Amino acid sequence: MAMTEQQKFKVLADQIKISNQLDAEILNSGELTRIDVSNKNRTWEFHITLPQFLAHEDYLLFINAIEQEFKDIANVTCRFTVTNGTNQDEHAIKYFGHCIDQTALSPKVKGQLKQKKLIMSGKVLKVMVSNDIERNHFDKACNGSLIKAFRNCGFDIDKIIFETNDNDQEQNLASLEAHIQEEDEQSARLATEKLEKMKAEKAKQQDNNESAVDKCQIGKPIQIENIKPIESIIEEEFKVAIEGVIFDINLKELKSGRHIVEIKVTDYTDSLVLKMFTRKNKDDLEHFKALSVGKWVRAQGRIEEDTFIRDLVMMMSDIEEIKKATKKDKAEEKRVEFHLHTAMSQMDGIPNIGAYVKQAADWGHPAIAVTDHNVVQAFPDAHAAAEKHGIKMIYGMEGMLVDDGVPIAYKPQDVVLKDATYVVFDVETTGLSNQYDKIIELAAVKVHNGEIIDKFERFSNPHERLSETIINLTHITDDMLVDAPEIEEVLTEFKEWVGDAIFVAHNASFDMGFIDTGYERLGFGPSTNGVIDTLELSRTINTEYGKHGLNFLAKKYGVELTQHHRAIYDTEATAYIFIKMVQQMKELGVLNHNEINKKLSNEDAYKRARPSHVTLIVQNQQGLKNLFKIVSASLVKYFYRTPRIPRSLLDEYREGLLVGTACDEGELFTAVMQKDQSQVEKIAKYYDFIEIQPPALYQDLIDRELIRDTETLHEIYQRLIHAGDTAGIPVIATGNAHYLFEHDGIARKILIASQPGNPLNRSTLPEAHFRTTDEMLNEFHFLGEEKAHEIVVKNTNELADRIERVVPIKDELYTPRMEGANEEIRELSYTNARKLYGEDLPQIVIDRLEKELKSIIGNGFAVIYLISQRLVKKSLDDGYLVGSRGSVGSSFVATMTEITEVNPLPPHYICPNCKTSEFFNDGSVGSGFDLPDKTCETCGAPLIKEGQDIPFETFLGFKGDKVPDIDLNFSGEYQPNAHNYTKVLFGEDKVFRAGTIGTVAEKTAFGYVKGYLNDQGIHKRGAEIDRLVKGCTGVKRTTGQHPGGIIVVPDYMDIYDFTPIQYPADDQNSAWMTTHFDFHSIHDNVLKLDILGHDDPTMIRMLQDLSGIDPKTIPVDDKEVMQIFSTPESLGVTEDEILCKTGTFGVPEFGTGFVRQMLEDTKPTTFSELVQISGLSHGTDVWLGNAQELIKTGICDLSSVIGCRDDIMVYLMYAGLEPSMAFKIMESVRKGKGLTEEMIETMKENEVPDWYLDSCLKIKYMFPKAHAAAYVLMAVRIAYFKVHHPLYYYASYFTIRASDFDLITMIKDKTSIRNTVKDMYSRYMDLGKKEKDVLTVLEIMNEMAHRGYRMQPISLEKSQAFEFIIEGDTLIPPFISVPGLGENVAKRIVEARDDGPFLSKEDLNKKAGLSQKIIEYLDELGSLPNLPDKAQLSIFDM
């Protein structure tokens, strides 16, 4: 007998093991009506009819269970039909998020959409959106797919409407708000339950109960024999097992309360995304939480195409954490690494120093060095890492050593240049080493009296086959050399032919190296002839040239070079060039060979020298300071393409340093290739240790034929070791590490490939991973076991033992000294307090001053206050207001010393005449500016209203010992003056810009990775690209400077006690030098002044200049001004006209779309509420999903939600908590650390409501109230001009804050402008950044036009270069507002106009340099009326 559809449903429920989870009515009445099967696509679609909706949690459980059950057979989907759709609207709200996830929207847009409210009306679902832009975007993007998703869940929906919130929908919203409130109450209950659960778990742990999950294990054990490499996964499969290390993990909570985990793993063959839903009534979540980046897992599941990321992913059924054998250093006695590069080696090293230090400590190494290229920026982190891991840190650097003066002439002869005979010669060889390679061609010409008088050209037989590289370079073949004479014969003949002539060669050190080596092997000894190097000569006398190669010089001197890299042709070209150079030397007064070096030497000689790598190791604290001086000089004084260290500089500051020979680019390695052993040993004596590096690192030298073969390389090692033994200098094996493990090398390849001019940008890079002792011993096994142990282990440890403990960073603050600072700050504070509050100060004022002064003076901070006071005073004296940032406004002393305008005392009245005051200490008033107007009961004068109620603790900490960070907003145009004033206060050598280090950002790294893969023709899935991006992210790319940070060095120390110095981004033309260390590294050691540039003070200054109104006299509580934050009525326009419900376009802090929406939601009416808005808009998780919902559901209003960090401390103290606990809670919440059990208990004991606790738990970051108050004060002042002096406001706004103009639209009528704005709103999601900036300007222009003002076209006669000017009821734009017209051209137009009128467009082009495109734009704008294309001459002009 066939089963009924109900029986089929029961069987299905049993099979997928959810019968016990379903409601009885559903289980008994549910029907499985049919299954649509597609064998081709391997899909099954179950059609199910239910009597009522499944609870959302049960629905997700059902879907997940059925997918898991049949995952090995088919991809399963379900379509539900619900016969009784009662409460469809209620269920729609709960299913909304799931249905959104079924669409193809981006994660960001999905997140935005999930925040929206729903209203069900029959078969129509309304989604309430914020504005027309959202409505149009969502309607186009997801309407159809969202309807389909709802219908698949069983909803009877005909239409989805995206609708903006209008007043007639309020009654529909009421029921929804009740529902949300119910959910909020439920959330509060869940939070309480969660707390109780935490308590219980903590108690269990204290009882040593080890039941907590510390290792992930979900599903069945996975058989290791089933594991396959990730790179082998190329298509959908039913059951696959892999293992890999986690490099990214994301655990997301769904609305149902369940979670989904997304893990990215790699086995270093490739990478893959793994996904899994938590199962109901299982402890999957705890298992997932046990996972973290760096752990290895084994996973099994179905490989399927993820439609969203468009890539293969694994839907896991099983996952288990595994222990993976890590790389070990098994040697009994460990080595010490003396040469490694971190992420601070610009675009070359990969890991941060902390990773190296941890690895060295794990391997048991006793010490480790850091030697980045040319910089020491890893030192601060190195110190911290070494302290953490208990390992000795050795500080060093790999620098670029140059000889101070590279000679142009060698072996000076007393010979008059014009009378001398010269032999200009060139050699072609089998390679670059005169010790290991051979001459194959020697060609020369003899020159006398400016003419070539003889030639010499010979091949020589090397008795070995030429490499393909040499054949291609020289065009000499083996056949050409078969019958050639021996080199001994050629050189003997050549020596006789040369006689006593002066040798001339281009890059003479190379050619003479082969000649001298050949002479010595023949027993002649080195040549005694004079030499001139045309390469160095050109670099000296042709400083304007950027190149000095033979090809380039031949073109410059007009000399024909027919076949470069054939000796005779190169020689003849060099000869003709040299003849002209002799004339140049004569003009420079150089007449004799022995005068060349003396008369042509200059202070830039270091630029001509070829740099050799050198390793500098700090031996003691004195050496550290000397290294700082060397680094600074190399970056500031001797920078040429790269930082350079003249040998004289190293000699001057060598004390406390150990000097090593570095790598194959070092002077000693080059000498082994180019000089005999006696010369090598002589050079070796300059160094304190000799480095040899693994043969694997030199394999590319063999590949590039710079070293003949492995046997030659081994001989080079032996010569280096012999040089060390002979000179008594230790020889150590160093790894030249650039990354940790072999598999990290790909990241370095990608970074190098991103630099086209980098000499390392070759097809292969050597393996430069951090090697264990075993690996290093194995690399040098060819030396024999004893010798290998000596250089790898014994010598490195002995060298490390010679190095003292060095501390690169100070452990305390060193502030400048200013005589009498303590007394001056105290006197200034009380003097200004008495001016404001009277001679008989209120006790609250005295108490606050004394409390702050005790901390400020007691901790040595008075000088910091005094410096800030001087800077502010100078700016005020020069006519520019200064705005404060950060929490300095929390300090009443800062207020009384006029550092900030924010008064942090509780709200109060003050009589300006008789000085009586009245304070409100009960928290009933948020801001003194919100107090009602009142007259003095004693004298009748209008009272001053002040006080923002901000505790001092938010500035200097509860104990008052936190170093003050005083941030000041100066006018952008005045900022350079403020910076330079610090030089007046402290001296030029005591102030520096705070340095920053710019690293490779994720987006940039993504471009590098994609570019590399494309160039290599490699395809990788997204997860592997993400891994490679992570590998490249964070590597140093450049340096910079803090926008306003000034570092002040105390007069009793110098900058090298703290950090080296440099120019930002190595820009030698920069006006300021910066700290070499990132300023965060020395933040607690030296004073940093934040002298920032800001538009608001500049705008205030322009408004003051235009109006004559002192901004300090502007009333903060002007009713019409306050009105614009909730309606545009006081501007004389309607919401429809300006397309906005507020009047805050262009008002700082309140003009963005995000904040305008906040204003619409909250409708603030007081200053304190505006401060709340400012705090809410700058915080993280303070408004969205937090205060916004509390206000919408009526739980509290704007004034009572948590807006700024200080609100928490003040609120809790008023609630009865001890100030210390209130402070602790505030600090914990503002840093996103939530609340501890103790904090929650204390708050509940003092009857703090649950919603307040819940709000605290959600917050990730909070804005200081003093910062918000200062910003709002500036905003209200600017808003005052907008309301009462509109043209002054619009002229100032367009001049100071706007940058992208569409003048064609701006000069039109108000209807046209409004239509343009409306059209741009409809296309907002598709607009680029520039268009959005233009839209911001047009919004202001539309408002201005609807207020009755208009914009004129550019006027050749009246327009200024940079400022908008007022004419009647109009503004005239400046030339700079023309798109594509730069500052210099704008100035030039005004200058040219002052010399006389423009006669034609041609005249305009000639005098002002305007392009044809700009002239056409001005013509279209109507700015060139009656201006002819060309001037017409009249008879009277002739």
UniProtKB/Swiss-Prot annotation:
Enzyme class, spelled out: transferase
Gene3D superfamilies: 1.10.150.870, 3.30.1900.20, 6.10.140.1510, Metal-dependent hydrolases, Nucleic acid-binding proteins, PolC, middle finger domain, Ribonuclease H-like superfamily/Ribonuclease H
UniProt key word Hydrolase: yes
Reactions mediated catalytically: DNA(n) + a 2'-deoxyribonucleoside 5'-triphosphate = DNA(n+1) + diphosphate
One record GO biological process: DNA-templated DNA replication
Domain of life per record: Bacteria
InterPro entries per the UniProt record, alphabetical: DNA_pol3_alpha_NTPase_dom, DNA_pol3_finger, DNA_PolC-like_N_II, DNA_PolC-type_N_I, DnaE2/DnaE/PolC, DNAPol_HHH, DnaQ, Exonuclease_RNaseT/DNA_pol3
Record carries keyword Flavoprotein: no
CDD domains found in the cross-reference section: DEDDh (cd06127), PHP_PolIIIA_POLC (cd07435), polC_OBF (cd04484)
Enzyme Commission code(s) on record: 2.7.7.7
Domain Exonuclease: 422-578
Gene Ontology molecular function: 3'-5' exonuclease activity; DNA binding; DNA-directed DNA polymerase activity
Keywords of the record: Cytoplasm, DNA replication, DNA-directed DNA polymerase, Exonuclease, Hydrolase, Nuclease, Nucleotidyltransferase, Transferase
GO cellular component: cytoplasm
Chief location of this protein within or outside the cell: cytoplasm
One of the Pfam families matching this protein, by short name: DNA_pol3_finger
Location within or outside the cell: Cytoplasm
Annotated function: Required for replicative DNA synthesis. This DNA polymerase also exhibits 3' to 5' exonuclease activity.
Family named by the database record: Belongs to the DNA polymerase type-C family. PolC subfamily.
Name under which the protein is recorded: DNA polymerase III PolC-type
Organism: Staphylococcus aureus (strain Mu3 / ATCC 700698)
Organismal lineage: Bacteria, Bacillati, Bacillota, Bacilli, Bacillales
Gene name tied to this protein: polC
